[in-house]
């Protein structure tokens, strides 16, 4: 859309009038002409036709009264007399001599101008170039009214220490000559080059010559010649990567020649600078691919140098103002924007008026030999290390009437650099409070790399995520919301490719090999830094102690300058900025890190701006750059001295050529990264991660130590088997966690370390209470604190070595006691295991028998006792094991008639039990050791019991094999109750009952269990529905009978624990549906091939009278005494419940009735017993033990019932005294 002359002049004059109106309204001298709205110039402006589509002016309340045009500048000057002086007024600064810039006019870049009207105010130049003799000077004929009035065209730089003070203050840093340079010079002219191309001109060209680059395309320069746009050519732009028009400041008092070029973006994007210079469609990738050119080039073609990158033109044409816009919203948006700009221009004017008389010290002027009237170009005085301080009320405009989208970043080489310097300074930034001073922080470091050669060779570039070859910036890396989440609508601009970044993915400028570098600029004592002001009171500050060589990692923000030394190898250094997106946290981020040195009033973000060494071969890439804000302002102040170098000295760099240079630099940089990594300051997240790793390592070490002290090795000795194996002794917690991994089929060799720390022996009190004992003698710390006796067991060395006699655990091969499916490395699977001074190393191969061979078991010399720890916890050899099982069946079977002898011995000979369940073998051995004639075997009774007890503690809800596990539990309960370990027997009783319930054995003979989903038809469909078992168990008659006998023995054990102690019964009859077992003689004659029992089982019912009737109706000639024992225990359970109940009192009627009923049931049971069940002489030898057992239990029932009934009665009536019944029952037990 072309721009006509009336529309252009209208916008230009409107902006000029408003700016002057704001400045003069805030000046100390108020003229009456400001209130007069009926001047000649105002009337003339009202005659100008309004823009089409402009229906009405919408002004905010704060700007009411500003919608009317103001008189022209000339008419206002002619009619307004100079103000009278007042004592409190400040004089305005004198107007310096103006210079008229020559406009580069080319046929292709002609601008539509009006033949009847020409600009009345010439183009302005920056104060630093007013006295520059290089450009022709054209005297400006100002009206006479200008002589008494003083206007400053640019905002002077105030002292960085006094942000809130009107008077200049002394800067606290110890710098001899403190100088605050002026802003860059601004040359406004019309050119054929687009705004984006012109704004990308840089002073960091490698050659510093005026010849155009060979890779510049002239066709590209004139591609958009038909579009009229504003071109700002700066005398010197200090940009490192691609700093653009964000560095230009437009004077609020020289807008007469300004041509506004509003784009199609929204007003918010313009005001807040959320737009790249290339236009609304320019993305970060497009902006990063631009290469700044040499601003000193005579032709603007050098400004499009891409350094060999044949990239397409990224800037889009910027449409100019159309006096007749088709969109009515454009005019309203432009008015809103103009109002905002005028408001900030007023603020800038006030700021300028406050600091109008700041001047450099005379000593500094004399030292630098600069006349007071001479404006020094700040670009020539700046060094590569500056600091940026957010200045209040200092908004700047860019070339397309929007606020700058990036802060000016200037880098000049430091002429004081020493060649081959090895200083390293780490560049760190932080979120810190706005008021936090610089000297409160530490830890800045930056690398100094030796690079280059005499001809200034290029460094190889490494592809990154933001390079054109790799696809550019996408996804989360370009999400500016993570960097500046408090800016509204920022995510929308990111999606549209409009992100306010200036350093995101810019290419570094390196010196060309064909163009030698020129001499450097004179040194300056002050240093600078770059600041990006963010919303919410934060600012992003970049601080560079020195200049480093450019890094060609495209994933970082490379800020570089050409080397200025002509021939010398002054290897510079440049820090690389790696920007990482960090999510905003609810807590204050700046409180986490406070190690970065910052200047007063500077806020930095350590997480978002990280400095890493240049030329690093690391592949981390992040192209998200910190967003900018129109609040960003550039201020120069003395640099903070960097910390001393921390890196070790390296041999001098030897320049090479070609691929050798690349490889040498990568290796060298990698080595420096490794050596310098420890010196880098870690953040709160790194500290937390290190703490977590340390905790994990400590936990693993503790587990490993615990493993060494908690593994036991078990195994039987079998001289007939060449294989050997081990079983690891574990705690229940360890086995439950790792039981699925166990498989001793592939156990490996056991080895013991050369030195194992001797375990302290805990006292009996601490071991019983499961407390940690310090093993102090004669009294440990806990016993001393509790005031109890402290006793220690006698060491095993004093008891002698029990591993004698027939047992030879180490000389003979061993058979493996295994649990099925066990295959584990003890170090990994048993971190909670309890060792006996062993370090296990399972490395042996399997033997021919399918069991792992035990190749080496060495004992530590520091073992707590002299006996072999492995032999103490091994099963006996095969012969001894068969002997022990035979002793059990010969002497103890009548107490545990739940084993089918022939089937059990067959499995023992075949080794099936050794494979499936060593628990039952340990239990049998500990009981059979009581009747063994060998004293050495009897001494091992406790050891076998402890191992069986420990093995059962490892079982879970559904153990395998279920039958052998429950049988072993019965044996353990019996041994524990007779050996004095009542606590274990009581706990084991409850556990085994719950395991039986979980396996469904308690309802194996039920016909109806509706609550469990079992119906009568399920009985005929198969036992798996009744048992609820996943395994094929109880399929033949022998297994079924073993299950029945095992469950009835469990009920017997439960009643034996309940009636003497008064504890409740663990097995309720209501959930017990198992038929009475058949005669033992018939049971032992059964074979596994038989599917049905030779005799039917008597069903069990809860009604005791019905149960006695069922027993009397049996016509089997073989007397089944065990059936009567089971019925007697059912009766004993009922008596125990009535006597030990907590509900009824002794003198209540209900209690007396229950006792009378139980007494009658005892009498009925005695009368129903056959003669062979009551007389030992008439009973068969196999049943004599059961006869004695039955008589003892019947007398126990009578004694318990009668004693409770008569203990409170008077002994006077001996005839009716029931106490005699209790005494008689006790006498009968004694006689038996």
Swiss-Prot record:
Gene Ontology molecular function terms on file: DNA binding; DNA-binding transcription factor activity, RNA polymerase II-specific; zinc ion binding
Species name: Phoma sp. (strain ATCC 20986 / MF5453)
Chain intervals with Low complexity compositional bias: 194-212, 508-523, 616-626
Top-level taxonomy: Eukaryota, Fungi, Dikarya, Ascomycota, Pezizomycotina
Region (Disordered) location: 33-94, 182-330, 355-402, 438-484, 502-525, 572-682
Reported function: Transcription factor that likely regulates the expression of the gene cluster that mediates the biosynthesis of squalestatin S1 (SQS1, also known as zaragozic acid A), a lead compound for the treatment of hyper-cholesterolemia by targeting squalene synthase (SS).
Gene3D superfamilies: Zn(2)-C6 fungal-type DNA-binding domain (4.10.240.10)
Pro residues bias spans: 80-94, 639-654
Annotated Gene Ontology cellular component terms: nucleus
Protein name, entry field: Squalestatin S1 biosynthesis transcriptional activator L3
Sequence ranges of Polar residues compositional bias: 224-254, 285-305, 585-595
Keywords tagged on the record: DNA-binding, Metal-binding, Nucleus, Transcription, Transcription regulation, Zinc
Gene name of the encoded protein: L3
DNA-binding region, residue intervals: 763-790
Basic and acidic residues bias locations: 384-399, 474-484
CDD domains recorded: fungal_TF_MHR, GAL4
Record's subcellular location: Nucleus
GO biological process entries: DNA-templated transcription
Disulfide pairings: none
């Amino acid at each position: 859309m072309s721009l006509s002359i009336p529309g252009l002049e209208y916008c230009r004059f409107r902006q000029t009038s408003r700016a002057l109106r704001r400045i003069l309204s805030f000046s100390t001298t108020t003229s009456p002409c400001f209130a007069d709205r009926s001047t000649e110039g105002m009337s003339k402006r009202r005659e100008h036709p309004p823009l089409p589509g402009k229906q009405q002016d919408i002004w905010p309340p704060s700007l009411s009264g500003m919608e009317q045009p103001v008189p022209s500048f000339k008419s206002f000057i002619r009619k307004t007399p100079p103000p009278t002086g007042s004592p409190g007024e400040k004089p305005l600064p004198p107007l310096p001599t103006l210079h008229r810039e020559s406009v580069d006019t080319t046929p292709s870049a002609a601008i539509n101008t009006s033949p009847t009207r020409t600009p009345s105010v010439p183009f302005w130049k920056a104060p630093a170039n007013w006295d520059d003799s290089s450009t022709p000077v054209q005297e400006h004929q100002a009206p006479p009214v200008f002589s008494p009035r003083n206007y400053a065209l640019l905002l002077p730089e105030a002292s960085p220490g006094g942000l809130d003070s009107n008077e200049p203050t002394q800067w606290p840093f110890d710098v001899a000559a403190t100088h605050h340079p002026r802003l860059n010079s601004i040359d406004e002219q019309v050119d054929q080059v687009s705004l984006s191309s012109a704004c990308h001109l840089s002073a960091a060209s490698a050659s510093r010559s005026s010849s155009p680059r060979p890779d510049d395309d002239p066709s590209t320069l004139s591609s958009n010649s038909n579009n009229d746009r504003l071109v700002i050519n700066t005398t010197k732009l200090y940009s490192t990567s691609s700093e653009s028009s964000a560095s230009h400041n437009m004077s609020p008092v020289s807008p007469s020649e300004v041509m506004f070029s509003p784009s199609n973006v929204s007003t918010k994007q313009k005001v807040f600078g959320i737009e790249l210079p290339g236009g609304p469609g320019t993305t970060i990738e497009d902006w990063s691919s631009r290469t700044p050119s040499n601003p000193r080039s005579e032709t603007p073609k050098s400004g499009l140098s891409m350094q060999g990158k044949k990239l397409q033109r990224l800037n889009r044409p910027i449409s100019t103002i159309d006096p007749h816009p088709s969109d009515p919203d454009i005019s309203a948006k432009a008015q809103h924007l103009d109002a905002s700009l005028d408001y900030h221009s007023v603020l800038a004017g006030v700021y300028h008026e406050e600091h109008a008389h700041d001047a450099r010290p005379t000593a500094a002027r004399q030292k630098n030999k600069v006349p007071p009237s001479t404006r020094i170009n700040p670009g020539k005085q700046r060094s590569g290390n500056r600091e940026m301080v957010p200045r209040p009320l200092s908004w700047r405009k860019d070339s397309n009437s929007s606020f700058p989208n990036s802060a000016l970043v200037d880098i000049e080489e430091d002429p004081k650099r020493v060649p081959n310097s090895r200083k390293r300074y780490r560049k760190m930034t932080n979120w810190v409070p706005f008021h936090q001073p610089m000297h409160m922080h530490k830890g800045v470091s930056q690398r100094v790399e030796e690079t280059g050669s005499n001809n200034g060779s290029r460094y190889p570039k490494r592809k990154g995520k933001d390079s054109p070859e790799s696809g550019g910036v996408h996804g989360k890396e370009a999400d500016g919301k993570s960097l500046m989440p408090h800016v509204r609508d920022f995510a929308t601009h990111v999606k549209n490719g409009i992100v306010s970044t200036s350093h995101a993915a810019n290419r570094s400028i390196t010196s060309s090999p064909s163009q030698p570098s020129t001499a450097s600029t004179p040194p300056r004592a002050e240093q600078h830094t770059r600041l990006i002001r963010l919303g919410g009171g934060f600012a992003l500050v970049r601080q560079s102690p020195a200049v480093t060589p450019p890094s060609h990692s495209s994933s970082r923000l490379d800020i570089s300058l050409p080397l200025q030394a002509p021939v010398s190898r002054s290897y510079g250094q440049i820090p690389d900025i790696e920007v990482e997106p960090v999510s905003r946290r609810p807590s204050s981020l700046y409180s986490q890190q406070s190690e970065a040195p910052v200047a007063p009033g500077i806020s930095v973000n350590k997480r978002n701006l990280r400095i890493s060494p240049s030329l690093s071969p690391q592949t981390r890439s992040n192209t998200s750059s910190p967003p900018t804000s129109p609040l960003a302002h550039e201020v120069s102040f003395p640099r903070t001295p960097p910390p001393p170098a921390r890196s070790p000295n390296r041999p001098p760099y030897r320049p090479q050529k070609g691929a050798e240079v690349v490889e040498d630099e990568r290796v060298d940089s990698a080595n420096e990264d490794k050596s310098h990594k420890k010196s880098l300051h870690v953040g709160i997240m790194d500290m937390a991660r290190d703490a977590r790793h340390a905790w994990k390592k400590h936990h693993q070490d503790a587990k490993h130590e615990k493993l060494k002290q908690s593994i036991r090795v078990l195994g039987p000795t079998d001289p007939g088997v060449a294989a050997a194996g081990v079983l690891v002794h574990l705690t229940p917690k360890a086995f439950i966690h790792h039981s699925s991994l166990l498989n001793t089929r592939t156990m490996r060799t056991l080895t013991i370390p050369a030195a194992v720390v001797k375990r302290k022996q805990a006292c009996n009190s601490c071991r019983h209470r499961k407390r940690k004992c310090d093993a102090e003698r004669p009294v440990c710390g806990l016993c001393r604190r509790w005031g109890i006796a402290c006793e220690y067991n006698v060491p095993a060395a004093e008891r002698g070595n029990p591993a004698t006699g027939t047992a030879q655990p180490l000389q003979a091969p061993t058979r493996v006691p295994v649990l099925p499916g066990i295959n584990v490395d003890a170090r990994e699977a048993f971190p909670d295991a309890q060792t006996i001074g062993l370090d296990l190393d399972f490395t042996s191969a399997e033997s021919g028998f399918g069991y792992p061979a035990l190749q080496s078991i060495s004992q530590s010399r520091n073992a707590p006792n002299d006996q072999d720890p492995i032999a103490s916890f091994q099963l006996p050899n095969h012969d001894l094991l068969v002997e022990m099982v035979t002793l059990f069946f010969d002497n103890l079977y009548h107490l545990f008639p739940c084993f089918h002898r022939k089937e059990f011995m067959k499995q023992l000979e075949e080794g099936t039990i050794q494979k499936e369940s060593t628990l039952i073998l340990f239990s049998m051995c500990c009981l059979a050791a009581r009747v063994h004639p060998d004293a050495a075997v009897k001494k091992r009774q406790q050891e076998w019991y402890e191992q069986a007890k420990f093995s059962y503690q490892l079982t879970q809800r559904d153990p395998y094999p279920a039958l052998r596990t429950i049988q072993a539990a019965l044996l353990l309960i019996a041994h524990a109750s007779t050996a004095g370990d009542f606590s274990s027997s009581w706990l084991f009783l409850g556990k085994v009952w719950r395991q039986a319930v979980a396996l469904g054995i308690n309802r194996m003979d039920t016909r109806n269990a509706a609550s469990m989903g079992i119906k009568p038809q399920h009985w005929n469909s198969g036992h798996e529905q009744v048992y609820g078992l996943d395994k094929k168990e109880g399929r033949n008659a022998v297994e079924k009978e073993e299950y029945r006998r095992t469950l009835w023995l469990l009920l017997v054990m439960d009643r034996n624990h309940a009636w003497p102690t008064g504890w409740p019964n663990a097995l309720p009859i209501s959930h017990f549906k198992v038929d009475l077992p058949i005669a033992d003689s018939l049971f032992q004659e059964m074979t596994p091939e038989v599917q049905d029992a030779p005799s039917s089982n008597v069903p069990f019912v809860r009604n005791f009278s019905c149960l006695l009737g069922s027993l009397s109706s049996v016509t089997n000639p073989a007397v089944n005494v065990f059936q009567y024992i089971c019925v007697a225990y059912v009766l004993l359970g009922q008596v125990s419940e009535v006597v030990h109940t907590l509900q009824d009192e002794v003198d209540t009627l209900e209690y007396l009735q229950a006792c009378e009923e139980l007494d009658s049931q005892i009498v009925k049971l005695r009368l129903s017993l056959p003669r062979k069940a009551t007389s030992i002489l008439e009973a068969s030898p196999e049943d004599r033990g059961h006869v004695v057992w039955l008589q003892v239990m019947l007398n126990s029932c009578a004694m318990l019932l009668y004693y409770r009934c008569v203990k409170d009665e008077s002994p006077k009536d001996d005839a009716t005294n029931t106490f005699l019944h209790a005494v008689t029952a006790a006498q009968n037990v004694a006689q038996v």
